[in-house]
A protein has these predicted regions:
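Bacterial N-terminal signal peptides that target proteins for export
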Residues: 6-19
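Substrate-binding surface in catalytic domains of secreted glycosidases
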Residues: 308-316
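Boundary at the C-terminal end of the N-terminal hydrophobic targeting segment
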Residues: 31-33
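Aromatic- and carboxylate-lined catalytic core of secreted/periplasmic carbohydrate-active enzymes
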Residues: 364-404
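Bacterial N-terminal signal peptides
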Residues: 18-29
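N-terminal low-complexity, Pro/Thr/Ser-rich intrinsically disordered segments
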Residues: 36-60
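Short, conserved loop/helix-junction motifs that constitute active-site signature segments
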Residues: 294, 320-324
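Active-site mouth of glycoside hydrolases
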Residues: 53-300, 310, 333, 337-346, ...
Length: 404
């Protein structure tokens, strides 16, 4: 694999299931408005009143689906991860100098039928020092919110990324648990203050795939490994120090939720997790972040599922473990280890319990892919985007649980 590749495929294969590299190579997709001003007091910019087309999204009164707050209509997520562009760059790498690219990509995602875009914000780009947020990055985030409102797309804002280890400040990496959590709280406090008034925010995802160390193992690195140059999995502590894992997870979640709620008491909060219940099924334990001991302040469940060939039923059985009385979103999915048809079967089979599905888009349209001499990964991507576009009216037109 080329070192510059930053795709989710590498992350999933190497960090979770350690499949042979030769298998990975056959599946990996080759990667191919004026700024808002900061307030005079130096605090983050807020986004002004929303476009009328976007309603605020909340869990339903039964706690088991999403609804549009004003109309009460059910809302089903059909979205994409916009985690990098076609050349593997993170959004902060180009959203200043190439804003037109972001605008075009949002139009393209909308044309595919997506209603939610998951963006991945990096800690180092939004935090200058242990006590100071980056006003420039926050202004650009406010600009992104305006674009989302104008385009009619909701944002799943995933934060605290350290995907490029070389960009992580040494002072942040050297911190102990308490100080690191304080910086993470500053990140979310600043982001929430910027986003609080915009209905374009679907949710805040506290961190992509947080993990904890073993009960009797003290770790030395906050990041869980180097996968083709990117780090997608991150530890929230280096040492449990005799504490139950769920207690540490709850303390971390509650601290960051409190930081958000200091500015924003409306938008939903979640954590996108590795589905260990799937990887170890049927010997599955209760999820750490979505247990009754931990998830009190999380509004819905987010899990990342990549069904294997011939194992769709197993994936569905494992997914059911995460049906814990909250809305459920499959926040990452792609035909990485199965066919497009099998992933479609997984989607259909999950509609009885799931309230949304989020795949991937990397800035290359179906038409652009069709114009190329595609290799296998490119063909998989093209076929999947075609499926995604065709499936959108069915998903968005009929709802899910109430119609199954």
């Amino acid at each position: 694999l080329r070192a510059e590749m930053k795709s989710i495929f590498t992350k999933m294969e190497l960090s979770r299931v350690a499949f042979p590299v030769v298998f990975l190579i056959t599946q990996v997709t080759l990667l191919q408005a004026d700024p808002l001003t900061e307030r005079s007091n130096g605090s983050p910019p807020s986004v002004s009143a929303p476009e009328p087309e976007l309603e605020w999204i909340r869990p339903g009164k039964d706690g088991n689906r999403f609804v549009r707050q004003e109309s009460g209509a059910e809302f089903v997520v059909w979205g994409v991860n916009y985690d990098h562009d076609r050349s593997g760059r993170l959004i902060e790498d180009y959203w200043n100098e190439e804003w037109s690219t972001v605008v075009e990509d949002f139009k393209e995602m909308k044309s595919l039928g997506a209603n939610v875009v998951r963006v991945h914000l990096q800690t180092a780009r939004f935090i200058k020092t242990s006590h100071e947020a980056n006003g420039s990055a926050l202004r650009q985030l406010a600009r992104l919110l305006k674009l989302a409102e104008k385009t009619g797309l909701y944002l799943d804002i995933t934060g605290l990324g350290c995907y490029h280890k070389q960009d992580v400040p040494e002072w942040y990496d050297a911190m102990d648990e308490t100080d690191r959590w304080d910086v993470q709280a500053l990140f979310w406090s600043s982001v929430a203050e910027t986003c609080a008034q915009s209905p374009a925010v679907f949710c805040y995802d506290l961190m992509n795939e947080p993990i904890l160390p073993g009960a009797r193992k003290k770790e030395t690195d906050w990041l869980a490994g180097d996968f083709a140059g990117s780090h997608f999995v991150q530890r929230i502590t280096l040492d449990l120090a005799g504490r139950p894992r769920k207690h540490v997870a709850k303390a971390w979640v509650d601290k960051l939720v409190s930081a958000i709620r200091g500015h924003d008491d409306r938008h939903m909060i979640t954590v996108g997790v590795i589905p260990w219940a799937h990887h170890f099924f049927p010997k599955a334990n209760q999820p750490i972040f979505y247990s009754k001991e931990t998830d009190e302040n999380l509004d819905f469940t987010s899990v990342h599922f990549y069904p294997k060939k011939g194992e769709v039923n197993k994936a569905l059985a494992a997914l059911a473990i995460y049906d814990v009385g909250k809305p459920l979103v499959i926040e990452e999915m792609f035909p990485l280890k199965c066919s497009v048809q099998e992933l479609g079967s997984f989607i259909d089979g999950s509609r009885k319990i799931a309230d949304g599905w989020i795949s991937f888009y990397w800035g290359q349209t179906i038409e652009e892919l069709a114009a190329e001499d595609l290799n296998l990964p490119g063909a998989i991507t093209k076929n999947w985007l075609e499926y995604f576009r065709v499936k959108a009216p069915e998903i968005l037109g009929t709802g899910n649980k109430s119609n199954q």
